[in-house]
Amino acid sequence: YSVDTGRNVYLQPSLASQGVKGTVTNALASAFVGSLGGGKSFCNNLLVYYSVLFGGQAVILDPKSERGNWKETLPEIAHEINIVNLTSDKDNAGLLDPFVIMKDKEDGATLAKEILTFLTGISTRDGDKFPVLISAISNVSESEHRGLLNVITELRKENTPIANHIANHIASFTNYDFAHLLFSDGTVKNTISLDNQLNIIQVADLVLPDKDTTFNEYTTIELLSVSMLIVISTFALDFIHSDRSIFKIVDLDEAWAFLNVAQGETLSNKLVRAGRAMQAGVYFVTQSAYDVSKESLKNNIGLKFAFRSTDINEIKQTLEFFGIDKDDENNQKRLRDLENGQCLLQDLYGRVGVVQIHPVFEELLHAFDTRPPVQRNEVE
């Protein structure tokens, strides 16, 4: 409800694409920004839950594995919840291999190129290494068994100093148990299904880089983790291109982790554009408005939710993201003084106001509570 008027605020997330008179955007994408503990995840979860309840379909990328108990805490829709927990267990080997996860052969090869250039740092401008890598990926793409491990084999067949160097570089990533999700020999029979109404994808042992870490400082495990997020998000494109008559949501929690790298930024724009055509909203959940403020993305975001922030630079960035005066002290104070569960909301008509997110049902409050148990008990 509106904090200023006390009146209920009604949201229909799929409305943007229907060209309703008076709306200032036809973008289905949404952004949820704000520092930890302000209610960002709760609001996001609530919106996804109700969209599913009203007939929509959703895929949630859950890098912190906070939604693993939803089958128990949301028993009334448990039969429609599909939790895909990707551990480094042998049964899951290769499930995130680009050649395995993408239905289309060419899409698989394109994603393999994205992932291997990301991991190795080989740029398209590298006239020595790049053509050798692309040639190996193309050969694997045309073979019977397609998998990233076979790219290493293909490079070694080449047996030139450059090909061997690239092969050794890629092979060094496979020494981590965690990497088995990403690398396969192309004989994997298991696949990830997103046929349920509410699909949650979790990757165990994911280690995301710190928000302020530059790309050059990423550790090997962080590079692998971000690679997996890119693979899963690209896989979500297949989900977006399913039945156009059903409203779909691709929910990207901790979105900053891949918005901060070039491949992730390109992918985000691709998801948003596909979503607009196929009646799917891409939801970016992130701590900073800066992550979603690049012009190419910002102009394609419809609903905006901003939760409390105390950092003045962050406050100004958020106000600018909303298109309101960032230097106005009253605006700054409004954002700084938001209580838990309150947020600044910009709707499809461009109106901005403070709303209180109210779950109505107590069981939803417990289901979507992401606070650690100790803190929760203290509050209760």
Q: Residue spans of the language-model regions?
A:
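Glycine-rich phosphate-binding loop of nucleotide-binding enzymes
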Residues: Y1-L86
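P-loop NTPase motor domains
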Residues: Y1-N8, L15, P63-S65, E72-I77, ...
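Hydrophobic/aromatic ligand-binding patch that stacks against planar heteroaromatic rings
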Residues: Y49-Y50, R273-A274, L297
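Short glycine-/polar-rich loops that comprise or flank the Walker A/P-loop
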Residues: F54-G56, I81, M278-A280, N299-L303, ...
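A short beta-strand-to-loop transition that corresponds to the Sensor-1 phosphate-sensing loop
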Residues: K64, V285-A289, S309-T310
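Short regulatory helix/loop adjacent to the ATP-binding pocket of P-loop NTPases
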Residues: N69-I77, D291-N300
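P-loop NTPase motor core of the ASCE superfamily
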Residues: K105-R146, S293-E380
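Sensor-1/coupling segment of RecA-like P-loop NTPase cores
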Residues: G275-D291
